[in-house]
Amino acid sequence: MAFVRSLLGAKKILSRSTAAGSAAPKGFLAVYVGESQKKRYLVPLSYLSQPSFQALLSKSEEEFGFAHPMGGLTIPCPEDTFINVTSRLQ
């Protein structure tokens, strides 16, 4: 039951943007997540200081360096892994 609550909470904080080219609102960062098909998520800037989110960023740096194919920050992990990590950051 706790997992379901954390997943529902993650959906409140993690906003999936429907307009891929739209600017992120103040206080949020747009990231592209997925292995083959990328989905755009908006995450709070406060996540940048969290060690588990930094681990995802390190994975991104290893794979892409600073040249991201989507034009924004791309995190190369399965979407469910991303949601699992970020749901714990609330």
Curated annotation (Swiss-Prot):
List where the protein spans the membrane.
none
Q: Return the GO cellular component terms, semicolon-separated.
A: plasma membrane
Pfam families per the record?
Answer: Auxin_inducible (PF02519)
Q: Does the keyword Cell membrane apply?
A: yes
Q: What does the function comment of this entry state?
A: Provide a mechanistic link between auxin and plasma membrane H(+)-ATPases (PM H(+)-ATPases, e.g. AHA1 and AHA2), and triggers PM H(+)-ATPases activity by promoting phosphorylation of their C-terminal autoinhibitory domain as a result of PP2C-D subfamily of type 2C phosphatases inhibition, thus leading to the acidification of the apoplast and the facilitation of solutes and water uptake to drive cell expansion. Prevents the apical hook maintenance of etiolated seedlings. Functions as positive effectors of cell expansion through modulation of auxin transport.
Q: Which InterPro entries match?
A: SAUR_fam
Give the bilayer topology: Peripheral membrane protein
Miscellaneous comment as given in the Swiss-Prot or TrEMBL entry: Seedlings over-expressing SAUR19 display auxin-related phenotypes. These phenotypes include increased cell expansion, increased hypocotyl and leaf size, defective apical hook maintenance, altered tropic responses and increased basipetal auxin transport in hypocotyls.
Q: Which family does it belong to?
A: Belongs to the ARG7 family.
Tell me what this protein is called.
Answer: Auxin-responsive protein SAUR19
The UniProt entry's GO biological process terms, in alphabetical order, are: auxin-activated signaling pathway; positive regulation of cell growth; regulation of auxin polar transport; response to auxin; response to brassinosteroid
Query: What does the record say about induction?
Result: By auxin. Triggered by brassinosteroids, including brassinolide (BL).
Record the organism: Arabidopsis thaliana
Report quaternary structure and partners. Answer: Interacts with and inhibits PP2C-D subfamily of type 2C phosphatases such as PP2C67/PP2C-D1, PP2C64/PP2C-D5 and PP2C46/PP2C-D6.
User: Any idea which UniProt keywords this protein has?
Assistant: Auxin signaling pathway, Cell membrane, Developmental protein, Growth regulation, Membrane
Report the locations given in the UniProt record: Cell membrane
